[in-house]
């Protein structure tokens, strides 16, 4: 038997080194090297590529290109995040905080899929009785889905080859181990090798696999960063565990758009998809309040209306506070400087708090104009109309720049009964949606004047 060799692997990029160091020489990350045991694989161990032991060489012209077949999961929101459905042979990694609903949504999906295609649910964290209890509590169909409690990757793959499921769930990848390594499950080497064997099996058999991944206290997926590079799709489940809304976001997708967002609501019968998220994120209070404005953000392939709230108050600190929830804090500091320079509105003695209602994260620059409108409304203590929509990027010289998909954003506003919209001139349509007055601006000063007409 080959002698085991101790190496140090980086949890971020997967690089290995013979000695420990404070910084990874490959990716530059600090304090990411952990000790692993590397064993020489015996000859003929079957560690070949997806095409087998012999290389398969073709020119691009010789490769037949066909549209990747997809099949629906039964959930419109999940299909949207996946890019239109599940692709045969794809590997999807889904991560999120404990209790956010990762196992729930996958159990619901597989129970519904099992009535149409063979499905296998593999759990290393729960017993079969616990999975059955959860399915009955959610009133899910139980007669078709096969459940297996196992943590050995060799046993899991052998069972999958025998059952030949079209869809399989591994809950979770951190509990799975390979007998070829002596390290404990959840280690860098175990997670990497187990995931590699699952990816290889998925590509060879055409089975679509969902992997559940744990997250660290910083919110990143636990284990080696190479895990995210190996899979086809990476999804993150976001939201407060004690809240009602759950947001499923695609941060990597080889078969669809990234940053695609699916919205779900947690009920006593599990996760229910929200087909009209704009209606959920708009509070529509009885009376207009200062500091509140609605913007149209773009998530993946669809527009979504969200409410931005600002609170500006006199600061008693030497350095006024700048707090954001769902928005970029550095961009807020920049926009406040632009507001002072080109709008003549100083905030150096004011605390500024910003929040996006519903826990949505808005990272695109189309939120600039709405952010500044909310700050102005709170600072002057003057409410903005309920039926006003604002979006646009603001540059350092005070110009208002157009943003992508402006027409679709305006159509979404028109569907929800908005009457006025302040937008960049480049996004002004030739013919506005019925009932919507579009005010096109090119400068920040024009936008501020239009806000309080």
From Swiss-Prot:
EC number: 3.6.4.-
PROSITE patterns named among the record's database cross-references: RECA_2
InterPro entries named among the record's database cross-references: AAA+_ATPase, DNA_repair_RadA, P-loop_NTPase, RecA_ATP-bd, Ribosomal_Su5_D2-typ_SF, Ribsml_uS5_D2-typ_fold_subgr, Rubredoxin_2
Binding site residues for ATP: 96-103
ZnF bounds (C4-type): 10-27
Molecular function GO terms recorded: ATP binding; ATP hydrolysis activity; ATP-dependent DNA damage sensor activity; damaged DNA binding; zinc ion binding
UniProtKB keywords: ATP-binding, DNA damage, DNA repair, DNA-binding, Hydrolase, Metal-binding, Nucleotide-binding, Stress response, Zinc, Zinc-finger
Pfam family for this entry, one: AAA_25
Keyword hit for Hydrolase: yes
Domain writeup: Has a putative N-terminal zinc-finger, a middle region with homology to RecA with ATPase motifs including the RadA KNRFG motif, while the C-terminus is homologous to Lon protease.
Name this polypeptide is given: DNA repair protein RadA
Name of the encoding gene: radA
């Amino acid at each position: 038997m080959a002698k085991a060799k101790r190496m140090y692997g980086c949890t971020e990029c997967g690089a290995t080194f013979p000695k420990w160091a404070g910084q990874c020489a490959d990716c530059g990350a600090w304090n990411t090297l952990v000790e692993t045991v590397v064993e020489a694989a015996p000859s003929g161990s079957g560690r070949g590529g997806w095409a087998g032991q012999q290389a398969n060489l073709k020119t691009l012209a010789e490769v037949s290109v066909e549209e990747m077949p997809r099949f629906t999961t039964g959930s419109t929101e999940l299909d949207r995040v996946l890019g239109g459905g599940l692709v045969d042979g794809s590997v999807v990694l889904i991560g999120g905080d404990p209790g956010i609903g990762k196992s729930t949504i996958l159990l619901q999906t597989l129970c519904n899929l099992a009535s149409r295609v063979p499905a296998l649910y593999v759990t290393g964290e729960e017993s079969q009785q616990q999975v059955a209890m959860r399915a009955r509590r959610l009133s899910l169909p139980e007669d078709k889905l096969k459940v297996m409690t196992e943590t050995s990757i060799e046993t899991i793959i052998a069972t999958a080859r025998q059952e030949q499921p079209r869809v399989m769930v591994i809950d979770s990848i951190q509990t799975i181990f390979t007998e070829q390594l002596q390290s404990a499950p959840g280690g860098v080497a175990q997670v990497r090798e187990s995931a590699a064997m699952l990816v290889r099996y998925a590509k060879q058999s055409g089975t679509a696999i969902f992997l559940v991944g744990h997250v660290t206290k910083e919110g990143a997926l636990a284990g080696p960063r190479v895990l995210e590079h190996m899979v086809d799709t990476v999804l993150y489940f976001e939201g407060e565990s004690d809240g009602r809304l759950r947001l499923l976001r695609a941060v990597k997708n080889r078969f669809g758009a990234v940053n695609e967002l699916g919205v779900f609501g947690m009920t006593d019968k599990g996760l229910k998809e929200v087909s009209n998220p704009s209606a959920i994120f708009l509070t529509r209070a009885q009376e207009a309040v200062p500091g509140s404005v609605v913007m149209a953000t773009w998530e993946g392939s669809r527009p979504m209306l969200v409410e931005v709230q600002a609170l500006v108050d006199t600061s008693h600190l030497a350095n006024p506070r700048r707090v954001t929830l769902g928005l970029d804090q550095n961009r807020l500091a920049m926009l406040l400087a632009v507001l002072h320079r080109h709008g003549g509105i100083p905030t150096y003695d004011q605390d500024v708090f910003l929040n996006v209602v519903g826990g949505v994260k808005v990272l695109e620059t189309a939120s600039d104009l709405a952010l500044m409108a909310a700050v102005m409304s709170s600072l002057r203590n003057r409410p903005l109309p309920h039926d006003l929509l604002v979006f646009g990027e603001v540059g350092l010289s005070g110009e208002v720049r157009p943003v992508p998909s402006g027409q679709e954003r305006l159509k979404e506003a028109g569907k929800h009964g908005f009457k006025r919209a302040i937008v960049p001139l480049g996004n002004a349509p030739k013919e506005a949606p019925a009932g919507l007055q579009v005010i096109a601006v090119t400068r920040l000063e024009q936008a501020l004047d239009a806000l309080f007409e």
